[in-house]
Amino acid sequence: MSRSLAHRRSIVGLTSILTVIAVIAAFLALSEFSSRVSPASAAPTDAQPSPGSSLGTEALIAPVDDSAESAEPPSFRNVVMVLADDLDWKLFDQIPRLAALKELGMTFTNHTVVDSLCCPSRVTILRSQYIHNHKVISNIEATGGGWPTFKRLEEHKDNLPVWVSRAGVTTALFGKYLNEYPTRPGGIRYIPPGWDEWAVPISRGDSYSGYSYTLNDNGELVRYGTKPEDFLNDVLNEKARNFIADTNEPFFLYLSTYTPHKPFATAPRHLGTHLGTVAPRTPAYNSIGENEPRWLAKFPRLSDWKLSRLDKTWRKRAQSAETVADSVEAVMAELAATGKDKDTLVVVTTDNGYHVGKYRMPKGKRTPYATDTVVPMIAIGPGIPAGVEVDAMTSTIDLAPTFTEVLGGQVPDWIDGRSLVPFLPSGKAPENWRNAVLSESIGETNKSDPDYLPFIPPPFSALRTPRWMYVEYDDGARALYDQLTDPYEIRNVVDSVDPAFVAALSAQLAQLERCAGPSCREADAITITDPLPQVTP
């Protein structure tokens, strides 16, 4: 039995208007973001070597003046997080209204999820813990995850909304919470502690399609049908705007979309857009890599028919991702209209990434590769320099401590993450910042899981540094990718570099796999000397 497997068993899983080009209005800081830009009709380019690079951005905007950087972190009264579902960097950059955000705020280009799976990642966002610590390892109760597991472990009583509520902050969650909410425990009208305003679809319905769903709206069950005005994302956006307008106290708003998760729901106004787009033809697209791990090596190349189907999937995902831009637009417009843009931090990110045609895999997530684990993360607000890219290693475990610090709350000493507040004045990493982050895939999946796919890797643990991605699979396979010379992670060099270097990476990975709280911040700060010269690809 591999060391990773033994460890795991110990815990038991955003319109395209085809003839019109609109312009995003220039504004300072968080002024109204209400114009639209026509999505590109050509295939995405691959000029950018890093997942979050701003190369190729075509949005017409006026960046915020960042000439006067402050030595002290900016001060905010409110926080808004817009969380997408399954949004990778390639798709983000294809949506001009989303790509434009990189010129409005600070982009964290190495922001990594702890698990490329909805529920475990969302629990991490709330708890600032790796999944081996919060133990919600999958989407559904049957395989050790979902809302029932979160509640059974009583983690719903000690997480982000509770921490900021204690500081007098008014909280709201509109949209997706956790998979299988609210089956059984607490009942279908149940609202977890810490939330003052709550509009969350219950699991009995078709939330992912955007229609025919039921909202738990502050304890009242409200049924929505199939009319255009019933589209879930639009309903949630209106609730978010009303909350911003009506709340006079400091607030935390968590606006959580179901898009662009399959079946790639979108508003009627976005149907028929992005018709000329195709899935990104990166060097890894339908490719055969070098020295592939066993689970991947068995896949044949995708047929032309399958590739054409993937292009259709990509177009649907682009249409769906437009609704994420709608959500950001709604929030930004209301903040500007109410003057609350002057003291609000807005963070736009996602629970995990997604791949379409990577190697010979059709569509999905749950791999250690950057498409699935290195995700969009933008921080926008007064005092945050615009157009700045941060390449330091950050993680979803850092969101809760960041928001809690901004809002004047206190986090428990058992959290695994670090606050990102020190980055906000300039984008420079504070002293003793981490050198690596951990991603894990522990939980099993089955056909009742909304993210079930027959082609996922065996359980794994992965260590990601600014240069390297090292992964150990539970079937004994290992892989190492030099992202400096191989940004698409095609060449596994684990057998061709100094074994001592691989051993050092493995040792650090082992420490992170079993870390908890302060020991995570010790393990991720270990520095390992590169065995290869610093060269450009």
Go through each PLM region and give its residues.
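A short aromatic-rich beta-strand->coil structural motif
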Residues: 79-80, 85, 164, 176, ...
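C-terminal region of N-terminal signal peptides and the immediate post-cleavage residues
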Residues: 25-57, 67, 525
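Active-site-proximal N-terminal segment of extracellular/periplasmic enzymes that hydrolyze or transfer
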Residues: 49-116, 488-500
